[in-house]
Amino acid sequence: MKLTCMMIVAVLFLTAWTFVTADDSRNGLENLSPKARHEMKNPEASKSNKRYECYSTGTFCGINGGLCCSNLCLFFVCLTFS
């Protein structure tokens, strides 16, 4: 019984993890080539060259603490210790 409950929780967690970390699939594979050509013509349009702003304290950060200005994400919220 306990093993069954643990397996159900693990499957639900992994399913949620897949949805949270998945890329936006609306573009699909058919649009990858035009985007790549555009990025080759204009290297500044590349995602790797974009600078993202950090999230302030109290904002939702998901599972990536690097998005917070303080680099501290606990329970999906950016925190700051002072």
UniProtKB/Swiss-Prot annotation:
Compartments, as annotated in UniProt: Secreted
Disulfide bridge partners, by residue number: 54-69, 61-73, 68-78
Keyword Lipoprotein: no
PROSITE patterns: DELTA_CONOTOXIN
Pfam families: Conotoxin
GO cellular component, one term: host cell presynaptic membrane
Signal peptide (UniProt feature, chain positions): 1-22
Positions of the propeptide segment: 23-49
Tissue expression pattern: Expressed by the venom duct.
Principal localisation: secreted
Gene Ontology terms, MF aspect: sodium channel inhibitor activity; toxin activity
InterPro entries associated with the record: Conotoxin, Conotoxin_d-typ_CS, Conotoxin_omega-typ_CS
Function description: Delta-conotoxins bind to site 6 of voltage-gated sodium channels (Nav) and inhibit the inactivation process.
Domain notes: The presence of a 'disulfide through disulfide knot' structurally defines this protein as a knottin.
Family to which the UniProt record says this protein belongs: Belongs to the conotoxin O1 superfamily.
The name this protein goes by in its record: Delta-conotoxin-like CnVIA
Upper taxonomic lineage: Eukaryota, Metazoa, Spiralia, Lophotrochozoa, Mollusca
